[in-house]
A protein has these predicted regions:
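Short, solvent-exposed amphipathic alpha-helical segments in soluble enzyme
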Residues: 49-51, 77, 146
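Redox-cofactor binding/interface segments in oxidoreductases and associated redox assembly factors
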Residues: 34
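Alpha-helical scaffold segments in soluble metabolic enzymes
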Residues: 100, 104, 140, 213, ...
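Canonical P-loop GTPase G-domain recognition
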Residues: 59, 66-131, 150, 251-254
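Helix-rich effector regions associated with P-loop NTPase G domains
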Residues: 1-31, 39-48, 52-58, 65, ...
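Glycine-rich phosphate-binding P-loop
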Residues: 127-147, 151, 177
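Conserved active-site beta-strand-loop modules that form the wall/rim of enzyme catalytic pockets
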Residues: 92, 142, 172-175
């Protein structure tokens, strides 16, 4: 399968509502934190956000760094810095980099705070809106900052509840927003990246096609990690179908009679990739 053939169009009604809520709340916000997936920094950048956010100070939080290729992450960091935006690499699951993110937000808010002080306004919390695609880790970040599970999160795209302000002890008031996608992915590589990382519900794309493309990418860029995980050998001339067959045999993904159960292989590879069990991979090239 060619990447150009991978098509997705997904814009649930609740995302339209979330976008409208975000537009109405932006007037109350002092700083915006846009969370990106470090494995797909380009694909997880929502092109609609700039129109919504306007000139608000923005900090980029590159999340899930422990699942991404370290060398590629460093290149992405420099690229984002070169664009003029402050950026922090974080891992919300472990708390890595979260303190640095708080410092970056406070620094971005300093011009706003200085204006308040000139007007005699004191002790007002800095209001921060956290934005990003589904499953990028917004609620996990707030849970980490608050220190308790005040924001319910689920490992499914588009299920975080309505917007809510959460006050934390660092003089920040955070707004968690439901993940918002855009209605059409003009670049099929973006749809593919969002699909395999779990930002899009699986019922709107062909999982087997997605895994074929993913395996093709891993064979080209990270063959040793892939082979080590599934204990298979890669012979010259092996294509994606051959590799899927080898994984099926190695992992017992077989139907009665010894037929390959490709659907089980697809589920296995997707699950392992999303959990970071295959290794540290970056899909988007800087």
């Amino acid at each position: 399968m060619m990447l150009e053939d991978f098509k997705i169009q997904w814009f649930p009604g609740h995302m339209t509502k979330a976008k409208r809520m975000m537009e109405s709340q932006i007037k109350l916000v002092d700083v915006v934190v846009e969370m990106l997936d470090a494995r797909i920094p380009r694909s997880s950048t929502n092109p609609m956000l700039q129109d919504i956010l306007g000139s608000k100070p923005k900090v980029i939080a590159l999340n899930k760094i422990d699942m991404a290729d370290k060398a590629q992450t460093d290149v992405w960091l420099e690229k984002i810095k070169h664009s003029g935006l402050p950026v922090c690499k974080i891992d919300c699951a472990t708390g890595k980099g979260v303190k640095q993110l708080i410092s970056a937000v406070q620094l971005a808010a300093k011009p706003v705070i200085d204006k308040w002080l000139k007007k005699g306004v004191r002790n007002r919390p800095v209001r921060v809106m956290i934005v990003g695609i589904p499953n990028v880790g917004k609620s996990t970040l707030i849970n980490r900052l608050v220190g308790k599970n005040k924001v319910m999160a689920a490992d499914k795209p588009g299920v975080t509840r309505g917007q809510q302000w959460v006050t934390i002890a660092k003089g920040l008031e955070l707004l968690d927003t439901p993940g918002v996608l855009w209605p059409k992915f003009d670049d099929p590589s973006v749809g593919f990246a969002l699909a395999v990382t779990g930002a899009i519900k699986e019922d709107v794309f062909d999982r087997e096609q997605a895994v074929e493309l993913l395996l093709d990418l891993l064979i080209r860029k990270y063959p040793q990690d892939l082979l080590n995980k599934y204990a298979v050998s890669l012979e010259q001339g092996d294509d994606v179908n051959a590799v899927m067959a080898k994984i099926a045999v190695a992992r017992g993904c077989l139907k009665s009679g010894g037929q390959l159960d490709i659907d089980k292989v697809v589920q296995l590879v997707l699950r392992d990739f999303r959990a970071g069990r295959l290794g540290r991979f970056t899909i988007d090239e800087p």
